[in-house]
């Protein structure tokens, strides 16, 4: 209900947060499933009792992505206990795994991925070729008067969105665009996140037909 009902919606007139953008783009990366980002994986009491275990919707096994925008790590954060002991519960560990809902056909996301990969191979995201990877897809974004500059991109494992701008919208300056301001930040992070990781792209689903077209005769 927050999307403006006007013809320029396709050009980006809606206001979205980086988290909302990254959540939406995860559907492209995982082959068409709706996931829910989360931060806390598990909560334990000071006695080691499990009080909470996250159960985000997960992409079915055999499909491209994992649950959430980024998989939880093994690193644990300890919070100093407060007076009073919360009752231990085992219900949190007995949840049935939630299955993510498919919201886009796999053939549609495959074609879209191919188009977004061309942004990096041939378009405004060409700087990302410096990462030396063949599995990256993304898109630059720049609002009127360069008040916002974006770059969103992914491979089959990670989705990252970078926004640059001011709290009170004003121009970032002349010739400041998504490809010149946001993309270098995205490259710095993704270069580290994907270091030594093998390429991971969405497999071609059934029902896709690829043909070569003669550029002269069509």
Regions found by a protein language model. Name each.
Residues 15-218:
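A penicillin-recognizing enzyme superfamily signal
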């Amino acid at each position: 209900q927050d999307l403006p009902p006007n013809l320029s919606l396709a050009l980006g007139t809606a206001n979205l947060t980086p988290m909302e953008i990254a959540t939406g783009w995860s559907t492209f990366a995982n082959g068409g499933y709706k996931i829910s980002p989360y931060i806390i994986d598990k909560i334990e009491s000071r006695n080691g009792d499990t009080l909470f275990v996250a159960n985000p919707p997960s992409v079915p096994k055999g499909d491209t992505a994992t649950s959430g925008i980024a998989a939880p790590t093994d690193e644990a954060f300890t919070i100093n206990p407060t007076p009073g002991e919360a009752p231990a519960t085992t219900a949190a560990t007995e949840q049935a795994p939630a299955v993510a809902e498919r919201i886009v056909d796999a053939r549609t996301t495959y074609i879209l991925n191919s188009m977004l990969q061309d942004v990096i191979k041939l378009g405004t995201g060409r700087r990302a070729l410096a990462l030396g990877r063949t599995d990256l897809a993304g898109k630059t974004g720049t609002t009127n008067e360069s008040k916002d500059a974006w770059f969103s991109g992914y491979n089959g494992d990670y989705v990252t969105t970078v926004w640059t701008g001011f709290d009170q919208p004003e121009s970032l300056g002349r010739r400041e665009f998504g490809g010149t301001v946001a993309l270098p930040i995205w490259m710095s992070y993704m270069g580290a996140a994907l270091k030594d990781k093998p390429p991971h792209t969405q497999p071609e689903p059934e029902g896709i037909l690829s043909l070569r077209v003669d550029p002269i005769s069509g």
